[in-house]
């Protein structure tokens, strides 16, 4: 709907259109896709892996300073797809909330509790005229003491769901189609299979072979539940295993 025919419904975040749509929230989803990056998350039997593209827009940038993966606590990781500046403010607030939770209750914030907090925050941003929705889809990963590996996704509208596998970004639908086939029989992936499924899904939908420096991989394992970002050497090992398997 264009500005002229929108009747002002797309200018105000708090006003529904006659069709029952909130245009500003829809535009936030478009902003996520406009970033031109695709991210994938896969949950295995005893681990969770998230993979995203690493695009460095300027040759003079220090590559190590460009990242979409953020540790929230020692045990919880967040992968942000979309507007990185929006993600940073969300990450900072999430870190504060998780630290407060740890101080107040004496144990680490569970994955689903953090995901609900982020989703609640995003939902509030869709209600007030003086705010705008965040142009970010966040995947949160961690190991729950009772439920095991957990992968959640939160979007700009304030939805949050647990996933066996999911995707976000410009090729989201193609990735989901690929993952649905891979996860059809509810496989119990080992750690290596989880990482390699996520990387090969990204390779498949983007139809290109990556160098290790062109992707970022974040993992958590049940045996050692600390959130970790894989080094280029570790990513290289998985890329070699994938190419040998294919």
From Swiss-Prot:
Q: Which Gene3D superfamilies match?
A: Glutamine Phosphoribosylpyrophosphate, subunit 1, domain 1 (3.60.20.10)
A single BP term in Gene Ontology: proteasome-mediated ubiquitin-dependent protein catabolic process
Checking InterPro entries in the record gives: Ntn_hydrolases_N, Proteasome_alpha, Proteasome_alpha-type, Proteasome_asu_N, Proteasome_sua/b, Proteasome_subunit_alpha6
This protein's GO cellular component annotations are: cytoplasm; nucleus; proteasome core complex, alpha-subunit complex
Compartments where located: Cytoplasm; Nucleus
Going by the UniProt record, its keywords in alphabetical order are: Cytoplasm, Nucleus, Proteasome
Instruction: Family membership, please give it.
Output: Belongs to the peptidase T1A family.
Task: Report the protein's function.
Answer: The proteasome is a multicatalytic proteinase complex which is characterized by its ability to cleave peptides with Arg, Phe, Tyr, Leu, and Glu adjacent to the leaving group at neutral or slightly basic pH. The proteasome has an ATP-dependent proteolytic activity.
How this chain assembles, per its entry, is:
The 26S proteasome consists of a 20S proteasome core and two 19S regulatory subunits. The 20S proteasome core is composed of 28 subunits that are arranged in four stacked rings, resulting in a barrel-shaped structure. The two end rings are each formed by seven alpha subunits, and the two central rings are each formed by seven beta subunits. The catalytic chamber with the active sites is on the inside of the barrel.
This protein is called: Proteasome subunit alpha type-6
């Amino acid at each position: 709907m264009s500005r002229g025919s929108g009747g002002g419904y797309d200018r105000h975040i708090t006003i529904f259109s006659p069709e029952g749509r909130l245009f500003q929230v829809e535009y936030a989803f478009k902003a996520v896709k406009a970033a031109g990056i695709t991210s994938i998350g896969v949950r295995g039997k005893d681990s969770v892996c998230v993979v995203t593209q690493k695009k460095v827009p300027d040759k003079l940038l220090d590559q190590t300073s460009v990242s979409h993966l953020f540790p929230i606590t020692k045990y919880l990781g967040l992968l942000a797809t979309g507007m990185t500046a929006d993600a940073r403010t969300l990450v900072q607030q999430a870190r504060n909330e998780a630290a407060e939770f740890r101080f107040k209750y004496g144990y680490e914030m569970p994955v689903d509790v953090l995901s609900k907090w982020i989703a609640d925050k995003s939902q509030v941003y869709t209600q007030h005229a003086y705010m705008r929705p965040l142009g970010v889809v966040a995947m949160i990963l961690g190991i729950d003491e009772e439920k095991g590996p957990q992968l959640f996704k939160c979007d700009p509208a304030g939805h949050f769901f647990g996933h066996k596998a999911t995707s976000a970004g410009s090729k989201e639908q193609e990735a989901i189609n690929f993952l649905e086939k891979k996860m059809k029989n509810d496989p119990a992936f080992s750690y290596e299979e989880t990482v390699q499924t996520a990387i090969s899904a990204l390779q498949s939908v983007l139809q290109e072979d990556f160098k290790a420096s062109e992707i970022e991989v974040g993992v958590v394992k049940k045996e050692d539940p600390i959130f970790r970002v894989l080094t280029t050497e570790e990513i290289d090992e998985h890329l070699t295993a994938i190419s040998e398997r294919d």
